[in-house]
Amino acid sequence: MYGLIFTTFMIVIIFIGPLTYSEPFALVNSTLILSNPTFDSINPQFSVLNNSIYAAWISNLSPQNSDVMFKKIDNNAKLFTSILDISNTPGISNIIKLTNSKDNVYITWEDKQPDKWKLLFTKSENNGNKFDNVTNLSNTTGNVHLHDLSSVGENVFIMWAANENVSSTNKDIFFRKTQDGGDSFNDTLNLSNDKDDSLDPHMAINQNGSIVYMTWTECDTKHDDPICSISFTRSLDGGNTFTTSKIVSNKMLSLEGYEGYSLSNGTGVNASSNTIFPHISENVTVQEGINSINPTVFTTLEGKRVYVLWEQSIFGKGESEIFLTVSNDYGYSFNSTINISNTSGTSRLAHGQLLGDDIYVTWSDTLNNNKTFDVMLRKIDAKNLAGNVINLSNNSGNSVSPYLLVSNNKIYVAWIDDTNNSSVLLWIGDTSESPVMTKVMSNGQAEVYSNPLIFDTENKVWIAWTQYDDNNNHKIVLLDQEKL
C-alpha cells in the first residue's frame, strides 16, 4: 500500500554553459511516486544527510482529516522505508517544515485542533526510523499562521506567526529553541510585540547556530488595504536574546559601482532606472504606498553577510518588483537596496541561494507587461554588483514557480511551463565566466504539475514536484539526475 511506484517521465533539459551537443536527445528516467496514490498528497519537504533523503508531505485521508507523512529513501532509490504517519490526528495537519542534523530528524507542522491551530514538533534520533511523542510548541499563543524551522546539531530553532492569545486579533512573531535536540524547549519569546500584523516568518542561521537572523512581513492594520513592510531582527548569542526589530524595506539607495545591465535579448537599461531614490518616496500617500511582502533571508557560513530578499509593489500600480538588501556587518546596518528585476511588468515568486558571498536569484516575470510569465535569473556578487538578467524560459507560455539550486559550480533551475501542456523544465548553467550557450535538449509533457523543488546528494541532483493525476489526486514525484 505504501510502496514506491515507478513511472516513465520525460523532462526538458536546457544546458547553458560550456556544454554542447550535436543532436538533441531525450532524457528518460524512472520517477519515484513517494506518496500513496489512494490519497491526495501535497506540500512536500525534503532534507538530505549524506546519501539519505528524508521526505515529508501532507496526505488528505478524508475531507475532514489530513496527516503528515514521512519516508526515507537512499541515494540509489533502491532502499526506502514504509510511509510513516507522523501526526496521526483526527483533524487537519498542514504546512510542514523538515530538517536534520547528524542522526536527528526534526519535523514541525500546523495542526487544526478543536480550540485552535497549533504548532507541533516531533523528532527522530535514529535517522527517521522512529519518531518521538509530539510536542505542542505554541501552547502559550493563539492560532498559528505559518512558521519556519532551522537546526544545527541538537540546537533547533522555531519561529512562527500567531495571535498573542485565542481572543486577540493582531498577529505577532514568536520564537522557541531547544539545545538538547527537542527534549526540552526554552520559554516563548515575542519578537514583534506591536499593534501591527506580523506574518510570513523566515530565518537563517550561521554554520554553528551562534547567529540567528529573522525576517517577516509587518502590515499596518489601520487601513482596509494594509501597507506592508519587511521587518528584521537578529540574535548574536544563539537565540537567547534578540535586537529590537527594524524595517529593512522601502529604503532605496543607489547601486554603487554599477553602470547598468542588459536583458538576455540585449536590451540595455540605464543604471538610474535600476534604483528608486529616497526623495521619490517622501510624498507617497496611503493609496500609493510601497507594499513589501514574501521575504526570505540568507547568511554566509560565518554569519557576517546577511541578505534579505522580498517582493514589492510600487505606488499602488499593481506591478511588483524583486528587491534585495545586504548587510556586511552581522545585520547591524543595511547599506544597499537593489531592484533585481526592474521591469515594467509583474515580478513574482523569487527564490535565491548563496554561493560563498554571491547570491543567485530566480523569479517569474511578465517583463514589459506581457500576458505570460518568463523565468529570470540574476547574480549579485560580493561587491553588490549585479550581473546580467537571463531569461531562462523565453517562450510563449507561462513559466512559473522557479526553484534554484547551486552546487559544484553548477546552477540548476526548475519550473512549471504550460507552453504546450503542463511540464517540468530544468535549466542547467555554469557559474564560471565561460561563454553562454543555450540548446534545447528535449521536449516533454505529461499531466498537470506544480511546485517543483531541487536538492542534491553526493553525486545526484533530485527534482521533486506535485503531480495531479487522472483520479483527481495529487501525488508527490521524485526524479534523479546524475551531476554533471
Where are these regions (language model features)?
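Secretory targeting signatures
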Residues: 1-24, 55, 70
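Extracellular, repeat-based ectodomains that mediate carbohydrate processing or recognition
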Residues: 21-484
